[in-house]
Amino acid sequence: MAAVMIVFDFDKTILDCDSDNWVVDGFGFTRLFDKLTSTMPWNSAMDIVMANMHSQGITIDDIANCLKKAPLIPHIASTIKIAHSLGCELKIVSDANVFFIETILKHHGLFDCFSEINTNPSVIDEQGRLRIFPCHDLKSSSCISNLDSCPPNMCKGRIIERIKTNAEERNKRIIYLGDGRVITAQC
């Protein structure tokens, strides 16, 4: 029997909410965020909101503490730990960002269960501000999946295809767990 690889979405699959909205709402920046997302890509809006939060004295530690209060899907932590202990290879493909995902996974003792996290990059700059960038180039990104709704910053289908090819080469079966439609017809 082939080994198993489980690919998780993060928001609304591991986390019982959207991590971006959790932080934006938690610090009272919902109105600004909604205004920005009506005129620009989601990641660009998040980066601007992070700049506004930083300029108002909200620190990276404040953001981390907010994220640590975000609720997980019931029983997901034990499910992840059991799957990992049984030898399943676990990965994440998410339109969230590195800082948010890693902060939450580490807080719940789940970070080491995952062999790969595919998401939007984020860095803490020299001023201590969280910067969020798109996973794929907004100008040259083209979606290969069967989803017309892939955001311009991340084609999950492209990432899943790479993971799938790697899994097939290593004789692994893939299980995808997410809150939306299946990313590719072949998954």
Predicted features by range, described:
Residues 2-121, 125-126:
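Alpha-helical substrate-recognition element adjacent to the catalytic core
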Residues 74-81, 85-89, 96-187:
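C-terminal cap/substrate-recognition subdomain and adjoining C-terminal extension
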